[in-house]
Amino acid sequence: MFSKKIPHTLESDSDITSPLDLWYQERHNDEVSFGLHVKKVLHSVQSPFQRVDVFESTGFGRILTLDGLMMCSDRDEFVYHEMISHVPLLVHPNPKRVLVIGGGDGGTLREVLRHDCVQEAVLCEIDGEVVEAAKQFFPSLAFGLNHPRAKVHIGDGVDFVKKSAAAQFDIIIVDSTDPIGPGVGLFSGEFYKEVKRILTPGGIVMAQCESPWENKFDLAKVYGNLKEAFSSVYSMVGTIPSYPYGYWSWGFASDDVHPFESINFEKARAIEKGTKYYNVDIHKSAFALPNFLKQKLHGVVKNA
C-alpha cells in the first residue's frame, strides 16, 4: 500500500529516500497501480474485519482506504455517491423507505436524504470502525449518519437482509466493497434473491459492479448474479478518477421500472441544483455503453 522509497539522483549511481516522500499506492494488478502523495497519516486501525486508514493526500484531499483499497476521496467521492443514489430515487414513483447495505462512510446516505419523500433510510454497515472514521474525518460525508430520518445498524448485510420482513423497502442500494473479504457475500445470486424478497412491488436495486476495465472479476458474472433475481438489469457507467482505471459501473435491477424512461424531471431539476456530477443528461447518458462493454455484457444486461 505504501511506497516510501522515492529515488533522488545525486550522482550517477546513488540515491536517497526522503522521510517526507510518502505515497499511497493501490496495485490493481501486476501491471497497473494508482498512487497519491500523502502529506499525513491521520488514522489507522485494524478492525475485526479489515484495516481502516485515513490519509491526507496532496492531490485528492482526505482519502479512506480499507485493506489498502481506495473507498473514497474528498476530491471525487460525489460522483459515486450521487449516481448510486439519485438514479434509482428519481425513477421510483414513491420511494419512502430505502436500505443502504455497506456505505459506512455515509456518502450514499447523505444523497438519499436529499429526497424529502424518503421517510426512513436504513444503513447496514458491517464495520463500526468505518462509521467512526467517517464521523471523525469526513464530516461532509457523515452528517447523514445522525440524521433523524436515518437508522444505522452495525452488522452483516447478508444476515440483515435474511432476517428482514418481506416487502418493506422501496429501494435497496448495495454500496459494497469489492467482492473479496467482508464484501464477497454481497455479490451472490442467492443474496440478490433475498434482497428482492424484502423489496416492495416495483422496487429497485442499485449495486456497485466494479470497473469495466478490471479483469480480475468476471463482470458478466457480477451482473449475471443480479439477473438471477430480476428480469430487467442495466449497466450504468461513470468516471471516478481515484477508482481503478478511473471508470466505474453500477447495476440497476428491477422487474418493473426502467432506469431513465420515468425520470421525475421536476424533482431531478431541483436535486441537480445541489449536485456536482448528477444531472438529467448524465442520468440518461450513463446507460449508453461503449462497444467493448456491450460485448462483455451481451445477453446479460438490457442495454448491451
Explain the meaning of each model-derived region.
Residues 205-206, 234:
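Structural detector of well-ordered beta-strand residues that form the stable sheet scaffold
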Residues 192-193, 218-240, 251:
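Conserved Class I S-adenosyl-L-methionine
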Residues 65-66:
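A general beta-strand register signal
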Residues 52-62:
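N-terminal glycine-rich anion-binding loops that anchor highly charged ligand groups
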Residues 2-53, 224, 245-304:
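SAM/dcSAM-binding transferase cores
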Residues 4-23, 47, 72-204, 213-223, ...:
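The AdoMet/dcAdoMet-binding core of the Class I SAM-like
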